[in-house]
Regions:
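Mature, structured domains of secreted/extracytosolic soluble proteins
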Residues: 1-152
Length: 152
């Protein structure tokens, strides 16, 4: 990925994010995530989508499920550019967890899961560990996670 390119320009060239790109296209979010931002994206990789129950991804990609898909995807986006260092500071300053307001208006939590790792938690108690952090983009930053987190 190239820091001079935006989130979408980089994601479409990532072999590990083909499912995410297909979902972003189906939800009509390409224009938004190509915009100036800045955005912090907690980006599930293909393996994260593979962990969902069989048939979930094809079902979400159907036009009639665009609203649900948009809600899930925007739950992975936080306004602003939050580096791993920013996330660690927020977690350390708040007793081991930090609350983030997502682009869909709901809350995600960042929690320490070890001395070296943070995870993103949803309201249902599901977590996506940050496996790759600080993938800088012209309009934000991507942190790759190993599970799809879901809004209420």
């Amino acid at each position: 990925m190239y820091p001079s390119k935006n989130i979408i320009e980089n994601a479409v060239n990532s072999k590990d994010h083909t499912t995410l790109v297909a979902a972003v296209k189906a939800a009509g979010l390409v224009g938004t995530l190509s915009g100036p931002g800045p955005f912090t994206v907690f980006a599930p990789d293909n393996r994260a989508f593979d962990k969902l129950p069989d048939g979930t991804v094809p079902m979400l990609l159907k036009p009639e499920n665009k609203g649900k898909l948009t809600g899930i995807l925007t739950y992975h986006v936080v306004p602003g550019r939050l580096s791993a260092e920013d996330l660690w500071k927020m977690v350390d300053d708040n007793g081991g967890k930090a609350e983030l307001k997502t682009a869909n208006g709901q809350t995600l939590w960042i929690k320490r899961v070890s001395d070296k790792h943070l995870a993103v938690w949803d309201a249902k108690g599901h977590a996506g560990r940050i496996t790759i952090s600080n993938v800088m983009q012209s309009n934000g930053v991507i942190h790759v996670i190993d599970n799809v987190v879901q809004p209420n």
